[in-house]
Amino acid sequence: MGRGKKMSKPGDGRSGDVPETCRTGGTNENHPKMNGEVVHLGQPKIYSYMSPTKSPSGRPPLQEENSVAHHESKNLGKPTTETRKKAEVEKKRISSATELSVKSSKQRETECNSIGEYFQTKQELTDVQRNTALTPVDKLQSQKMVKNKSQRRKAQRKKSPNRKLTDYYPVRRSCRKSKTELESEEKMRIDELIQTGKEDGMKMDMIIGKGRGVIATRDFQRGEFVVEYHGDLIEITDAKRREASYAQDSATGCYMYYFQYLNKTYCIDATRETGRLGRLINHSKSGNCHTKLHNISNVPHLILVASRDILVGEELLYDYGDRRKSSIEAHPWLKN
């Protein structure tokens, strides 16, 4: 009697014949539970009504097909569980991507709404500023504030010492010369050379086919004074009379140079033999020198200036400028 409770006999139901999904938790045939197995959703209630003891011949075709699929899914075991896990992971990935797309669309909508609100608020502020004009009292107050600020700044500037460049460096005179000063110095130098009759940087030499000529003994830069064409300064009437007398003697050369000065025609007559070299410079249309008038105390002087850089040993040449037929007939070398 006191030996304990009697164990109830196990039921006659065959444990191997009933599906595992129906054994746990009672025999609830209408609502079978899943325990880690994949059950096809085609007709889930068919499995609970099927009995494994029935022969396949007595089953309908649909029941037979579902039972075969059910047994195959039970026999899969571990691969079926992995497939289910993969399906769950894929489902989670799709749901997360959907949530992200929904969130991004919501964020875009929120940003668009915030931008629209910003521009609307800005427009309202500008409208308010336009509508609310300053009163005369407010204008006076703002002007006073600006004046006070400017006065404060001026006071600060007065307090701070104004430093000059001379506080750090001593004043010194510039050594540079202006263009006018340089031109004035050059004129004074030429005046001195003309008045003294000094002729440096050249010598007289015999030129083949020409006779006497002048050769440079030093380099001359372009625009530099070379020599004066020295002779008698006479007016046009005297020049014509002398030229007629010189034409009677064929041995006399042509050393007369005509020019205009202050709307008046003058002539430099260098026919008389002197020791000056300017009168011996030969003619050439492509010479390396050209003539220029130089004024000394309102008296014109004819000088020769370098047209280009002249090297040592070059013959000094310039264009006489006489293109008259009579002159060319008398002196054919004027053509060159």
From Swiss-Prot:
Keywords recorded for this protein, A-Z: Cell cycle, Cell division, Chromatin regulator, Chromosome, Methyltransferase, Mitosis, Nucleus, Phosphoprotein, Repressor, S-adenosyl-L-methionine, Transcription, Transcription regulation, Transferase
Segments forming domain SET: 200-321
Keyword DNA-binding: no
Major site of localization recorded for this protein: nucleus
Post-translational modification: Phosphorylated during mitosis.
Bias (Basic and acidic residues) ranges: 67-93
Enzymatic reactions: L-lysyl(20)-[histone H4] + S-adenosyl-L-methionine = N(6)-methyl-L-lysyl(20)-[histone H4] + S-adenosyl-L-homocysteine + H(+); L-lysyl-[protein] + S-adenosyl-L-methionine = N(6)-methyl-L-lysyl-[protein] + S-adenosyl-L-homocysteine + H(+)
Amino acid composition bias (Basic residues), ranges on this chain: 146-162
SUPFAM superfamilies: SET domain
Polar residues: compositionally biased ranges: 95-104
Keyword RNA-binding applies: no
Binding site for S-adenosyl-L-methionine: 210-212, 255, 282-283
CDD domains named among the record's database cross-references: SET_SETD8
Enzyme Commission designation: 2.1.1.-, 2.1.1.361
Known role: Protein-lysine N-methyltransferase that monomethylates both histones and non-histone proteins. Specifically monomethylates 'Lys-20' of histone H4 (H4K20me1). H4K20me1 is enriched during mitosis and represents a specific tag for epigenetic transcriptional repression. Mainly functions in euchromatin regions, thereby playing a central role in the silencing of euchromatic genes. Required for cell proliferation, probably by contributing to the maintenance of proper higher-order structure of DNA during mitosis. Involved in chromosome condensation and proper cytokinesis.
PANTHER family, per the entry: N-LYSINE METHYLTRANSFERASE KMT5A
Stated name of the protein: N-lysine methyltransferase KMT5A-B
